Amino acid sequence: MAEGGGYRERPDAETQKSELGALMRTTLQRGAQWYLIDSRWFKQWKKYVGFDSWDMYNVGEHNLYPGPIDNSGLFSDPESQTLKEHLIDELDYVLVPAEAWNKLLNWYGCVEGQQPIVRKVVEHGLFVKHCKVEVYLLELKLCENSDPTNVLSCHFSKADTIATIEKEMRKLFNIPAERETRLWNKYMSNTYEQLSKLDNTVQDAGLYQGQVLVIEPQNEDGTWPRQTQQSKSSTAPSRNFTTSPKSSASPYSSVSASPIANGDSTNTSGMHSSGVSRGGSGFSASYNCQESPLTHVQPGLCGLGNLGNTCFMNSALQCLSNTAPLTDYFLKDEYEAEINRDNPLGMKGEIAEAYAELIKQMWSGRDAHVAPRMFKTQVGRFAPQFSGYQQQDSQELLAFLLDGLHEDLNRVKKKPYLELKDANGRPDAVVAKEAWENHRLRNDSVIVDTFHGLFKSTLVCPECAKVSVTFDPFCYLTLPLPLKKDRVMEIFLVPADPRCRPTQYRVVVPLMGAVSDLCEALSKLSGIAAENMVVTDVYNHRFHKIFQMDEGLNHIMPRDDIFVYEVCSTSPDGSECVTLPVYFRERKSRPSSTSTGAVLYGQPLLVSVPKHKLTLESLYQAVCERISRYIKQPLPDESGSSPLELGACNGSRSGCAGEDEEEMEHQEEGREQLSETEGSGDDEPGSDHGEATQKKNKGRPCPRRLFTFSLVNSYGTADINSLATDGKLLKLNSRSTLAIDWDSETRSCYYNEQESETYEKHVSMLQPQKKKKTAVALRDCIELFTTMETLGEHDPWYCPNCKKHQQATKKFDLWSLPKILVVHLKRFSYNRYWRDKLDTVVEFPVRGLNMSEFVCDPSARPYVYDLIAVSNHYGAMGVGHYTAYAKNKLNGKWYYFDDSNVSLACEDQIVTKAAYVLFYQRRDDEFHKTPSLSFPGSSDGGARPSSSQQGTGDDETYSMDTN
């Protein structure tokens, strides 16, 4: 076995590439096992074998050797090997089938102590089956009926059965196999549901992240401990159970759902975790299942329990719930006569029915908060992307739900085939009316009545000037935000002067700039020439990437740790220098063998050495000088019996080059040649003078060095070969990577951990950032949306005149607008390297949004809108939290919805940088009439004025339990 845990007998690069390439095309099969590999390691392996056709320049080079498989970057806790939250496929990890994993493991091994991260393939979807690897397992809270305070956490796959959970609970709570048990699903504060179908899967049962399950062993006399309580609660509804509004907080809030199910990476079965964590007092001492008397709640002011990262869904639902025309339609049961169960594009009416049931609960006035379990289960069945417990996008859920409701409620039973016609110079009004009528012939529902409008799209060929005008329906407006022209980066500068600590800077660089722009900006603040800077990405004590000056800054993600090193291209005498990456490693004995392993630590270095002086001795001196700031002098009883040769650390030259034999066996033959006090270095090992010198030194301890050198791969996990120690020049270049290996005792005595990690803050970090006027008006976004643009070279238009694809100019205009205008602010942007969120404040009116000036139909009616709801997103892309503001249709007051919590809000709180999706209601005198089938620009239909919406709402703040 090679150093670092890999096998020497591995196939050549071409064979590895061929075998893995075929396996990576394996299709997902339900129940199959797949493995997670850190994408950084996998990318290094791909470079090493030339996996990608565009990256085959350095195939097989030693410095690219990836070493043993290292998944440490995926763990939030290296000890328990728990996965980090919000890992993203291809960006953070890659998935490989079991056979591919086994091959890589045989060829390279795995970092010692790490267990494979294996997961199962599960199936989603009701009609169209969709397989995906279940990366995050579901965390369930388990307890016994007799001791509800003893709560244990355990992870399960959605493919596990209820019988599997029961078996695990029997084992955890020491319940004999012959004793009868019942399993209960407990949620909110006092609602139970028996899980009687043991062959149901976790997914079938609708269990969610943080769900509490109670196991109830039967009494010896054959009765059940909860029998009396069960009879009291037997009238509870079987779906979407609720609790009393008097319960202001959940008695088991301490075991509520964490942001994401991490699973247990040490579990190789992929079924459920063998490790169980114990919670504190998971339940209150009172374990009463009887529901409290119902109290009147203002209809519509109903919170939604978080089922584990479902705040995105709750936010979207609260906005739709407070869309009066749609909610009235469901509350009046008008949907029942229009359900289309035969629509092949629909969901057999099940989404419409699930939504109707939820809306009725939310507007019943009985429930302060409900858990939308069954609704989420139904959504997950038809849209697998929403079936898990990872953070999703509220706008994407809205898009799915509006489309799903439309198809479930489509009044058109058989859609006719219609041929699309081009305008061909006909008047816009004629073409628009034709397009809308054709749309209504195939799509006729309450969603079309309420949410659909019409775009005008104009394309002009740059070659023949052909003009193509089409009119297309839309359900919501996605508006771009003016892009930021620059970005702020926080980086560390490591000066060449070893006496100076690294300094953290905050610099402003062009958003789409190059690495050279970063160096120029840093040069202005530091005074160091930009040409003497090397920009690196440091990850896990190694250089993940060393950037070239012409590389784009979009390759650098906001979370990357960027270190800029000052280096010297020439020495003081003008000779050329070579700059070498150097890693710190500690040699540790492996408990299972007599060999040693190396563990990376500390901050890597870039060390410059004159090419004509690149010997082992000069390299040692250069490194010692570089680290002199954090080399400490040990106490007399700490340094051991042998003196230490500190080299340049204390200004002295080498006194002896003798190293510990176990550490530097490969440098044994060069010891005398590196010593100045023991001879000239020209003596032959067998000469009389050499032998006399050795005898002279034999009786006294020989100084040890701080560390030894190894030529390693760019990951620092595998040794390539030893360095020449005969005094000759070392054959190293800037692509070589060195490791300085310390034994544990020397590191403990001489290496000052605290000083090595200490850095200074530049004044740019201490000064508050200048806040530019970043707010933009909503009209600016609309104008940007309607601005003419040229299509990109990868997105051309096929010109029917030229008979070829052209980069035409394209312009969108608004022709007619719907009764409910949904505006999606496009805050999220991403490319192959990084993701970003625009936190720009968009100033949008709460009242009187006049869209008439943006509508190009000259005969259009006035379009004036009032805001009725906002979906908010706090945090970064892929993470964070969703909430909603919404205006209650009965009392006209604004409320803030944060999962289960509902509180009164003021209008001046609504416009924030978190606003993501806006809901506007058109001013119309008869808005709540049954939606007509007319063209959306017509004047029929209207809105009941909010002043006439009478209600007896309570103005107090509702503080409810958040799951």
From Swiss-Prot:
Residues modified to Phosphoserine: 445, 675, 680
Keywords: Cytoplasm, Hydrolase, Metal-binding, Nucleus, Phosphoprotein, Protease, Repeat, Thiol protease, Ubl conjugation, Ubl conjugation pathway, Zinc
Ranges spanned by the short sequence motif Nuclear export signal, renumbered to the chain: 133-141
Motif position, Nuclear localization signal: 767-772
Annotated Low complexity bias: 244-261
Region span, Necessary for interaction with SART3: 27-216
Residue pairs linked by disulfide bridges in the UniProt entry: none
Region of interest: Required for USP4 activation by providing conformational flexibility between the DUSP and catalytic domains: 229-295
Family the UniProt entry places it in: Belongs to the peptidase C19 family. USP4 subfamily.
Protein name from the UniProt record: Ubiquitin carboxyl-terminal hydrolase 4
Top-level taxonomy: Eukaryota, Metazoa, Chordata, Craniata, Vertebrata
The gene coding this protein: USP4
